């Protein structure tokens, strides 16, 4: 019985790529810098302390993958452990370092075109664009119109938004148009309708995602994002391995978390909502138990990126990794004879790096299963090697990009 599980530790890069110079990311290393901070005692909080402790991931080859990628073996991990998984690192062929590019490339479809961006840090959006959105949504105006951290913009503009009913429009270095609105005073349904309008009006701008950022709370310092985020993505520009599995093999692709949004629903047969790493883990375990032949369980653990990477929270990132590692054996225990488990990422987001944006890094490619031989997979020239490997595993037609490691 053919079953695979992909767990994406969103933003968990393991060392800068050769082209990081083009992104201002030379020297970035999400995993490496977290490990260094932990070893120096700079990542202690109420949830964790001391050196980074990831024995299960390390046993599968994560430490070795980081070393092959960056030349640095993460402090706190045992360099002499017996490796039981196949491990490697992959560079990104896509032009960007964003979520859709990384995920689409994982599924065999690299983004070889340039996304549209709103590059101006202030007055970021064209007036003709925002005028059309406001007219269709029957809104008097909007706030923001800038590059901003999602948490900072709530403190700066959240109270004014609640008083005026004007949505907060903002962007970042990624190809995104983000809209933040209060769930109670503005309404979640109204926010989602507004985002759909924005998605339609952005068609000519080639913007990767419109992101709904609902929040709650009474005032500054007390606002919190909710779990009702929605990503309205463009559709992948070519057929992904997910679609081939469904169309050619009658298979099932189970999306957990924001996976379905990232692929605009393409190739997804079941969508499971869960918020937070514990809930995402529980949902993953339940779907693995239910999964049948020719199925793919695909989970994105977004909090590594959104709650810790972008917020430059090293201690929180380390604690989340250790939680993930502690629960990983629960997944391993569910693997059947022919199952393949792939642990990977979609880009980097080094919490020690300047700014709040993603970092251009190699991603780990950790593969295990009862029939997967242990050892190094070496450097993979594209994330699409994962998609090509899945195409070979399921017996679909080949992907245009990538080489199988199975």
From Swiss-Prot:
Annotated binding of Mn(2+) 2, by residue: 305, 310, 358
Q: How is the cofactor bound?
A: Binds 2 manganese ions.
One GO biological process from the UniProt record?
metabolic compound salvage
Task: Give the EC number(s) under which this enzyme is classified.
Answer: 5.4.2.7
Entries under CDD domains matching the protein: PPM
Q: What are its cofactors? A: Mn(2+)
Sorted keywords for this record are: Cytoplasm, Isomerase, Manganese, Metal-binding
Enumerate the GO terms in the molecular function aspect. Answer: magnesium ion binding; manganese ion binding; phosphopentomutase activity
Catalytic activity reported: 2-deoxy-alpha-D-ribose 1-phosphate = 2-deoxy-D-ribose 5-phosphate; alpha-D-ribose 1-phosphate = D-ribose 5-phosphate
Location (main, coarse)? cytoplasm
The record's listing under NCBIfam families reads: deoB, PRK05362.1
Q: Could you identify this protein by its name?
A: Phosphopentomutase
């Amino acid at each position: 019985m053919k079953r695979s599980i992909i767990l994406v530790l969103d933003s968990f890069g393991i060392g800068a790529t050769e082209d990081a110079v083009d992104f201002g990311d030379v020297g970035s290393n999400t995993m490496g810098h977290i490990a260094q901070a932990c070893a120096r005692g700079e990542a202690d909080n109420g949830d964790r302390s001391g050196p980074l402790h990831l024995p299960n991931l390390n046993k599968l080859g994560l430490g070795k993958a980081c070393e092959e990628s960056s030349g640095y073996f993460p402090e706190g991990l045992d360099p002499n452990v017996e490796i039981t998984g196949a491990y490697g690192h992959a560079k990104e062929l896509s032009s960007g370092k964003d979520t859709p590019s990384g995920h689409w490339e994982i599924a065999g479809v690299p983004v070889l075109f340039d996304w549209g961006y709103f590059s101006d840090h202030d007055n970021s959006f064209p007036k003709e664009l925002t005028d059309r959105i406001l007219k269709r949504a029957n809104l008097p105006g909007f706030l923001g119109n800038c590059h901003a951290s999602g948490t900072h913009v709530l403190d700066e503009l959240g109270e004014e938004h609640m008083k005026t009913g004007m949505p907060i429009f903002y962007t970042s270095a990624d190809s995104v148009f983000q809209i933040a609105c209060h769930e109670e005073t503005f309404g979640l349904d109204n926010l989602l309708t507004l985002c759909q309008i924005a998605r339609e009006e952005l068609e000519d701008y080639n913007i990767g995602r419109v992101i709904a950022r609902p929040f709650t709370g009474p005032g500054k310092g007390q606002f919190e994002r909710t779990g009702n985020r929605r990503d309205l993505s463009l559709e992948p520009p070519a057929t992904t391995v997910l679609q081939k599995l469904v169309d050619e093999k009658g298979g099932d692709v189970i999306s957990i978390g924001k996976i379905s949004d990232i692929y605009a629903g393409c190739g997804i047969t079941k969508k499971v909502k869960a918020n937070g790493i514990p809930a995402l883990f529980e949902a993953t375990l339940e779907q693995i138990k239910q999964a049948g032949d020719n199925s793919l369980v695909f989970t994105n653990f977004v909090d590594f990126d959104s709650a810790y990477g972008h917020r430059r929270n090293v201690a929180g990132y380390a604690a989340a990794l250790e939680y993930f590692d502690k629960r990983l054996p629960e997944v391993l225990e569910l693997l059947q004879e022919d199952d393949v488990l792939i642990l990977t990422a979609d880009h980097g987001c080094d919490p020690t790096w300047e700014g709040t944006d993603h970092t251009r890094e190699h991603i780990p490619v950790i593969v295990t299963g009862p029939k997967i031989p242990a050892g190094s997979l070496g450097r993979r020239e594209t994330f699409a090697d994962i998609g090509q490997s899945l195409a070979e595993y399921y017996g679909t037609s080949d992907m245009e990009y990538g080489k199988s490691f199975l």
